[in-house]
């Protein structure tokens, strides 16, 4: 099969879907890999690195003219204009974006959105959400440390003692856990909150304190456990109690990192304007939920702003700020998914009996398959 890797055209997107490491493996399996010139430059991968492993370098038309096209972000209308029907497109194709899925269906492509892979042990190696969230959690702390005008670790010097920074992490998924681990390495004192009781042990294993809000009803406990590794909307009674508890900790925090997302919905508000007003001047909020509206109503997606003396970072694509490693992990996720649709005997196989393939299939034969 001919596999194309076009350059990403989304503003601020620096990642690339194939690295020389994964290109080499695809070529060893008998495939031809065509990379658009410059596709990997922003991720520190020059054209020569692809050529060294046997990949072809071409223009956008050559990459898009392939049997399979590997992307990071969902294609724009202009990219799909010359695509032949039946082309397979694999990437982070926004499964909850109905307009985008219809655009893919209208182009006649067979589209696989890797974000839709089930949260199962078998699918772990192709879990793009986790691989990219890991990097996002790390970078969130590094940005916070950069914006915060004090030190993270406690420092005892002849000139006096500097207190360790207090960091609050709201939402303890993959990004939140990595944020805790990174902040801990920098010497901060960390508290973390999440609706799921099962993460308490993970939080404490990383050296942070879990902000515990007891459940008073069976309904609250059931909702907190979530579905498929994702959080579910919580009952209002529990949210009110959590909000009060979190508000106390936010007021004491020097840095707050929010990571709470619910698939297909606007991000829940965790840090209200009143909470921001209660924070010390010079404190920092890094809102990882900015792409879905933000966990703080004062967040401005794509911007860093100062409100009520607090710096609020609304960066919408943190993994793209660590493009080389983000691309490396993402490319391995893509490679593992391709093993499911490119059997060793050759050709393309869309096996809907495979739960991962079925979950990721968004469009086929001009129809939107996702329900």
Each language-model region and where it sits:
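Glycine/serine-rich phosphate-binding loop and adjoining beta1-alpha1 elements at the start
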Residues: 2, 8, 75-166
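An N-terminal-biased, well-structured beta-alpha scaffold segment characteristic
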Residues: 5-103, 107
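Glycine-rich phosphate/diphosphate-binding loop of Rossmann-like nucleotide-binding domains
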Residues: 6-45, 153-249
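Glycine/threonine-rich flexible loop motifs
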Residues: 12-17, 78-82, 91, 229, ...
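A structured beta-alpha segment of the ubiquitous adenosine-cofactor-binding alpha/beta core
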Residues: 54-64, 74-75, 221-256, 260-273, ...
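Rossmann-fold NAD(P)-binding glycine/threonine-rich loop
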Residues: 95-123, 265-318
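Adenosine-phosphate binding glycine-rich loop
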Residues: 115, 121-159, 290, 296-371
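Short glycine/serine/threonine-rich phosphate/pyrophosphate-binding segments
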Residues: 174-182, 200-201, 259-260, 265-270, ...
């Amino acid at each position: 099969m001919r596999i194309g890797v076009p350059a990403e055209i989304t503003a601020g997107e620096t990642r690339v879907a194939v690295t020389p490491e994964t290109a080499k493996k695809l070529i060893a399996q008998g495939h031809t890999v065509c990379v658009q010139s410059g596709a990997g430059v922003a991720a520190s991968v020059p054209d020569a690195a692809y050529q060294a492993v046997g990949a072809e370098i071409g223009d956008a038309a050559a990459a898009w003219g392939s049997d399979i096209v590997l992307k990071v972000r969902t294609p724009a209308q202009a990219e799909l204009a010359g695509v032949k029907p039946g082309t397979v497109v694999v990437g982070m194709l926004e499964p909850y974006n109905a307009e985008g899925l219809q655009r893919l269906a209208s182009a006649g492509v067979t589209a696989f959105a890797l974000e839709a892979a089930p949260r199962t042990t078998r699918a772990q190696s192709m879990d793009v959400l986790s691989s990219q969230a890991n990097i996002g959690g790390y970078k969130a702390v590094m940005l916070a440390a950069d914006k915060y005008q004090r030190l993270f670790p406690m420092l005892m010097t002849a000139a006096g003692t500097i207190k360790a920074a207090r960091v609050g992490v709201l939402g303890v998924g993959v990004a939140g856990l990595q944020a805790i681990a990174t902040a801990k390495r920098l010497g901060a004192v960390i508290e973390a909150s999440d609706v799921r009781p099962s993460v308490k042990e993970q939080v404490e294993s990383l050296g942070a304190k879990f902000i515990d809000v007891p459940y008073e009803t069976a309904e609250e406990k059931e909702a907190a456990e979530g579905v498929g590794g994702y959080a579910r909307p919580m009952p209002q009674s529990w949210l009110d109690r959590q909000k009060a508890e979190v508000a106390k900790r936010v007021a004491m925090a020097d840095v707050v990192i929010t990571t709470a997302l619910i698939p297909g919905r606007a991000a829940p508000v965790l840090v209200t304007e009143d909470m921001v007003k209660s924070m010390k001047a010079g404190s920092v909020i890094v809102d990882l939920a900015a792409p879905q509206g933000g966990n703080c109503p004062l967040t401005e997606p794509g911007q860093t702003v100062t409100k009520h003396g607090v710096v609020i970072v609304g960066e919408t694509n943190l993994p793209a700020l660590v493009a080389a490693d983000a691309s490396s992990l993402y490319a391995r996720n893509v490679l593992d998914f391709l093993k499911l649709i490119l059997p060793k005997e050759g050709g393309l196989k869309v096996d809907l009996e495979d739960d991962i393939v079925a979950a990721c299939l968004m469009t086929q034969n001009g129809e939107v398959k996702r329900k």
